[in-house]
């Protein structure tokens, strides 16, 4: 059994968390390769190291004194080092880092949280330190060079029986540091798992896996013990944020299960993510997730269905503004484009004006204040009446549905409702498919 074991920011936030990590790693000999994030928040009011590094970079760019920021960063790392009794000369490394800020770019600066954390963890565990910049290779288009990366990872594994690896970054062919999106440490772990064809990719965080609904809305929602990659993609896209959604792809390509576990409660079962799951699931649905902050643009044109390329012409205008489209529900004479408010804050009316002037529809209507809620489940297609049950429950609870979208694989039913109905909608769906089914 060979595992890649990744610990998120909350799992390495201070010396106490480091001790938990050591206990977890040493309890299983197959946890040979460890990936770490930068230290996260110790309390709700605390700062993540990565946030502080972005702030430090902003001070650098605008030539503002950053001594207060560097002191906080220094104190965080040195408190971990000193409390654990580590011997490395971290003070010297930090001094050199802060002294060379003017020569560094943003990616180099913000990646140092993972870098210093991994160096501390390597000494604490007695493992080798392997720098991600020497292993993960980006192409110039910012995609992963899998051939080069796989060779480098396998060479490091051949050299070291155990190592600690910083997440979140790699380098390009010119040796320049390149980062993943925020939360990208999860991607780093998945890349290592793919490159060595690991038996399992463990992702340790501060929650015991995925829940069927947001616990801020639904009281004590059921745990999801098993979920498919596809289901997780659907839920992650709609806001279920335990694992970075792009971490799924490298593991999925080699059919490597991902196990979400809780550093603070290592005895909990967590959630296992895999390609397919045998047997009957306890409920018709797997989970519910959603997001607020959407606008729909309704385009109506009589006999639209007879006009070749009509929808494409509208979409090409939207594409000109580089706006991602969430859904395109349609009928014979009309269709709607659902987009995130954040993507059209300053361009919505200009874009709508172009649609009116260039495409000449009978009318265009915009509606803001829309929320999207997705109900996801791999077995929904095998249970006739699932969508009717969902719509009926919302109707009987006086929730008006503005939009409906269902994937062709019948794994996901998405409804659009008023933002003020968001919490109520999630609760009603949960009660319909989970609470009532338990009785």
Regions found by a protein language model. Name each.
Residues 244, 255-262:
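Acidic/polar loop patches that form or flank catalytic/metal-binding clefts of enzymes
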Residues 2-3, 31-34, 108, 127-128, ...:
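Structural motif
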Residues 36-55, 211, 260-277, 332, ...:
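Terminal amphipathic helices with adjacent charged low-complexity linkers/tails
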Residues 269-439:
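A conserved regulatory-domain signal marking ACT and ACT-like small-molecule sensing domains
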Residues 1-243, 248, 416-418, 437:
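Nucleotide/pyrophosphate-binding catalytic subdomain
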Residues 12, 42-43, 137, 171-173, ...:
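Flexible loop/turn segments at secondary-structure boundaries
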